[in-house]
Amino acid sequence: MINKLSLLLFSMLCYTLFFRRFSIAVSILFLSCCCTRIYSQQLINSSSSDQVRLETTESKIESILSLMTLKEKISMCHAQSQFSSPGIPRLGIPELWMSDGPHGIRAEINWSNWDYSGWTNDYITAFPALTCLSATFNPDLSNQYGTSIGEEARYRKKDVLLGPGINIYRTPLNGRNFEYMGEDPYLASIMVVPYIKGVQMNGVAACVKHFALNNQELWRGHINVEVSDRALYEIYLPAFYAAVKQGEAWSIMGSYNQFRGQHCSHHKLLLNKILKTDWSFDGVVISDWGGTHSTKEAALNGLDIEMGSPINNDTSPRQAYDANFLGTSFLELVKSGEIDERILNDKVRRILRLIMRTTLDSSRPLGKINNIEHSQVARKVATEGIVLLKNEDDFFPLNPAKKLTIAVIGENAIKSMTTGGGSSELKANYEISPLEGLKKRFKNASIIFSKGYSSEATNQSYKSLIKDALITASLADLVLFIGGLNKNRGQDCEAADREELKLPYNQDYLISELQKVNPNIGVLLVSGNAVSMPWVSDVKTVMQTWYLGSEAGNAIADVISGDTNPSGKLPFSFPVRLTDNSAHFFGELSYPGNGETQYYKDDILVGYRWHETKNIKPLFSFGHGLSYSSFKITDIKSDKKIYAANDSINISYKLKNIGSKDGAEVVQVYVGKTNSQVRRALKELKGFKKTYLGSGKQTTESITINITDLSFYDESISNWNIETGGYTIYVGSASDNISKVLGINLK
């Protein structure tokens, strides 16, 4: 049968070559034979025909698959350039084009190396980093963010956006934490779903990363993570589960690290069982770049597209990738029968499904880029994500009408934060620095600047920089120190971790000296990570401002001036010292490991779960964030006292803005199990709601919790289990600021 089909195809090819001028007639003939590109193209575009509208995407995929040669199938399973995988031109199947990253579309990269292409039309809007988005505690804003970045990806003709990142914040030293959504799996789950839906409504696939347990950059390419099943399912997988089941993500990126001795980009348990079987994921698994290590492992254990640089650079650029693991060696294993072609077909089906959802979706919009709406979304996310940690004597807001001399000290007041950081580096259409934003908003003030420290080589000594800063501070009515971390390697940057919790470049000393010269000082921290603050009791205010993207300076000025009332909440805890963090409490085998393996000895007690359960007071707690107003939560109650397994818990409350300014508060609901038979955290976030209220206004709100959300992963049955008996419900405005405690029972 195969020989007859091959003969038929060869005859048809000859027919085409000899009768080109009769191509239309030939195409009709070929269509009737169901063997040509025109037939496959009609299958692809059949949604435009009433007669074939009922034909499902899956039947189209099967029809196209039947027309593909073995070599064509293989070609779709690996890259053809740094950021694309090949199509099948003869069948009208287009290429797939991918792009970093989660908070902006990366500038164009050369076909076969990592140099930038030097285009003049690849400038984009830089959105705030995902730590900032998570700090908004605002799912609606997450959807606006995803929609906007999806529009920019679509305009740049990208089919797959390599983001969002949702790895759990386990250690404050992780160089890539700024790309993720914090330490709590529930918060990350709630925030990631609308982001994905926003991206994909543009016909662009979200590629959720990095699956899984990629919680540090140090030794990320090989470190083997050992963690309990319970911690895996309760802490490190829930956000990915939400991305797949509620967000309906079209692609997932495997991580570099190993888990239980197997690389995660081709992992039997993670990809074949959990993702594709248990969760019924029908999308594409894409390797992290260079994260593939074995043809057999990749073929058999769930990887669909291998991405990364070519292994063989001695051939033409388009052929260089054939030498990669899912290239020629995969082809030979299928030809020999060592690997069943059905395994290959499953990969190709998934890739075709992705293509149908993206580049072959004729209804997808054209996209937009660098428009005012995107700038507005970026600014809104930035202002809502800024977290006011401390505000002694109402230091903020500052009155823009007042004639003040303001000393702005610190390199981060002028340093670009859209460049650097690794693969998330951006080529922003514009970037307003904090100093620019302040000068624009505070036109009546005299703003004087001194760098104070430098992260780069300079002809000034650090002592000279400090001396100049102290002189500047002494001349001012107040000091705004704008420092923190940056995107340099060893700070908030891919491929390396920080070495310590303290601020770099002698900033702790500088802040202490500035306070002595001018005690009227506020500190603005730019970072995606927690830092230690030995000077915290000596300064008036501390504000966490993250990496805010194009609108950074405007957003900071909005909040400092009081144009926007801060409402951000911390998505991770700030420990007093490094050993207060759960990953570091257990020594180097827990973090960073011994160079080969690390053991997650903190198990399920990550972040605030550790602080609360072990009664270790953090510097600033998860969920903490101040406002220029004050809010009161009253009349807190549950709808029942006793619940059945299929019930939902409804927590109602009254929220009143008792301050003089309009603002927003995030009411947070935590739940803990009383007298549990297994180890459990004192409390876990199970619900939250952000509410905007005018000064003096009051509203009645409610938060619903599904009983199933009270379950734990029971390793004895390898499944979720719910304990009956008493539970404690904590309602407040932060994990350590609880307004009322309720007791309920589950029968």
For the regions a language model picked out, list residue spans one by one.
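Short beta-strand elements
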Residues: 738-747
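Glycoside hydrolase catalytic-domain context in secreted enzymes
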Residues: 41-712, 719-736
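Bacterial Sec-dependent N-terminal signal peptides
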Residues: 1-47
